[in-house]
A protein has these predicted regions:
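Helix-turn-helix
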Residues: 33, 41-75, 79
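Amphipathic alpha-helical packing segments from all-alpha helical-bundle domains
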Residues: 89, 119, 135-161, 170-185, ...
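Short, hydrophobic secondary-structure boundary micro-motifs
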Residues: 51, 124-128, 167, 219-224
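Generic hydrophobic, amphipathic alpha-helix propensity
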Residues: 27-39, 55, 80-84, 88, ...
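Hydrophobic alpha-helical connector segments
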Residues: 79, 90-122, 173-176, 200-203, ...
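Short linear capping/connector segments at secondary-structure termini
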Residues: 94, 126-134, 226-227
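C-terminal peripheral helix-coil segments that are non-catalytic and often amphipathic
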Residues: 1-18, 149, 153-160, 185-189, ...
């Protein structure tokens, strides 16, 4: 037999690359740094200023590195909207959960949202209302729905406890979201002084309006607003 006619094939094992915890952590930190840089940029100059190159410079990395995480500006803006939205909903939820009762939770949640929006009004406008691409706008709509759902949950809890009259909580929540956004950062919103006292008064007035709108009697609504912790939502700076 002519063994020279046989083809000898060597099987070389292929090592499957697996990211170590250190690599995963580093990637997550870089992702967070990019989002933080984009957030700071939007807070200063609006969403239109969120471009790959300046965000990369602010984050201290190369523009090519940003593209590895976000292939386009649209992807970066959508991720920024999602990150900020999630943080705001979480802050609102934690504040409301810490309140002693359902009506207090509703008041505290609304006040927290209002105070944080006023403290970062330019960023709030960029995330909520400034014109963006369709993809980012879709993420924005998800945020609005999440905000309405959070308020609706508080309304249902108050209705169940007998603290509010029966009502269509879904429509009421949607109406409150529209009123709050327009009253805080919309084109019809009046100019607001940066002085803490002026900010506090605005938050109290909007919270009072929201409570009255869903059926809280005026004395009770005023009592809830007065009881808002000064070191809580009204102290956001």
């Amino acid at each position: 037999m002519n063994y020279s006619s046989f083809l000898v094939v060597r099987v070389i094992p292929i090592m499957v690359y697996r990211r170590t915890e250190k690599v995963v952590r580093r990637l997550a930190q870089r992702h967070a740094a990019i989002i933080a840089a984009a957030r700071a940029t939007a807070a200063e100059a609006g969403m239109a200023a969120v471009q790959i190159a300046p965000v990369a410079e602010r984050a201290g990395i190369a523009a090519g590195t940003v593209y590895r995480y976000f292939p386009s500006k649209t992807d970066l803006v959508a991720a920024l909207v999602a990150a900020v939205s999630e943080a705001e909903i979480d802050a609102m939820r934690r504040a409301a959960d810490a309140a002693p009762g359902p009506l207090s939770g509703l008041a505290t949640g609304i006040a927290t949202f209002a105070a944080r929006a006023l403290a970062r009004r330019r960023l709030a406008w960029a995330v909520i209302a400034e014109p963006v691409d369709a993809e980012a706008d879709q993420v924005r709509r998800v945020y609005r729905r999440a905000l309405a759902a959070e308020i609706e949950m508080r309304l249902k809890a108050a209705i169940k406890a007998g603290a509010l009259p029966p009502e269509d909580s879904t429509r009421a929540a949607a109406a409150l979201v529209g009123a709050l956004l327009e009253g805080l950062i919309g084109p019809l919103a009046p100019a607001i002084s940066a002085e803490p006292a002026a900010t506090r008064d605005t938050v109290q007035q909007l919270t009072l309006f929201a409570l009255r709108a869903v059926g809280v009697t005026d004395p009770r609504a005023r009592g809830l607003v007065v009881q808002l912790p000064s070191d809580g939502p009204l102290a956001v700076g």
